[in-house]
């Protein structure tokens, strides 16, 4: 076997067992606009420290990621979500 064949076969086996593509949770539930009052749904897209998780981590599409960011910032401003985690500022 040559080096090219081993590289190709190793790459193919890695791709075959790769992680599945995540489906946007908002598109699956047919939600057009992300509501800032839906705190439970917003918290799923935030880290334990209160940061907004990136798309590659949550699997949200680009359109919903933009509206999710606005909704989280709006919920923070309305004091529905914390800016920082509770254990961080104590």
Curated annotation (Swiss-Prot):
Cross-referenced SUPFAM superfamilies: Ribosomal protein S18
Keyword Translocase: no
GO molecular function, one term: small ribosomal subunit rRNA binding
Entry keywords, A to Z: Ribonucleoprotein, Ribosomal protein, RNA-binding, rRNA-binding
GO cellular component annotations of the record: cytosolic small ribosomal subunit
One annotated GO biological process: translation
Gene3D superfamilies registered for this protein in UniProt: Ribosomal protein S18
Subunit and interaction comment: Part of the 30S ribosomal subunit. Forms a tight heterodimer with protein bS6.
Family: Belongs to the bacterial ribosomal protein bS18 family.
Known role: Binds as a heterodimer with protein bS6 to the central domain of the 16S rRNA, where it helps stabilize the platform of the 30S subunit.
Protein name in the entry: Small ribosomal subunit protein bS18A
Organism: Roseiflexus castenholzii (strain DSM 13941 / HLO8)
Gene encoding the protein: rpsR1
């Amino acid at each position: 076997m040559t080096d090219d064949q081993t590289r190709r076969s190793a790459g193919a086996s890695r791709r075959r067992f790769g992680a599945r593509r995540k489906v946007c949770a908002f598109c699956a539930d047919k939600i057009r606009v992300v509501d800032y009052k839906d705190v439970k749904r917003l918290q799923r897209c935030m880290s334990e420290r209160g940061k907004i998780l990136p798309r590659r981590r949550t699997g949200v599409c680009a359109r919903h990621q933009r509206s999710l960011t606005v909704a989280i910032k709006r919920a923070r401003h309305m004091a529905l979500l914390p800016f920082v985690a509770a254990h961080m500022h104590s």
